[in-house]
Design a protein with these regions (language model features):
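Intrinsic low-complexity/disordered segments
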Residues: 26-27, 38
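Short intrinsically disordered, low-complexity segments
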Residues: 8-10, 31
Length: 54
């Protein structure tokens, strides 16, 4: 499972969990989630993407 979190300049935050997607390597999955966080809002001030062992 993946955890994606971000904070934005206007004070809004997002925290969401994602299941693993078969056939996608770990680095690619992390990159896709980072892009998702950055595309949600133009002024991202902080973000984190972590893999969580269940």
């Amino acid at each position: 499972m993946w955890e994606a979190r971000a904070e934005y300049a206007d004070g809004s935050t997002v925290e969401r969990y994602f299941s693993e997607r078969p056939g996608i390597e770990e680095a690619e999955q992390q990159y896709l989630l980072e892009c998702w966080l950055l595309d949600r809002h133009p002024d991202c001030t902080w973000y984190s993407v972590n893999y969580i062992n269940e």
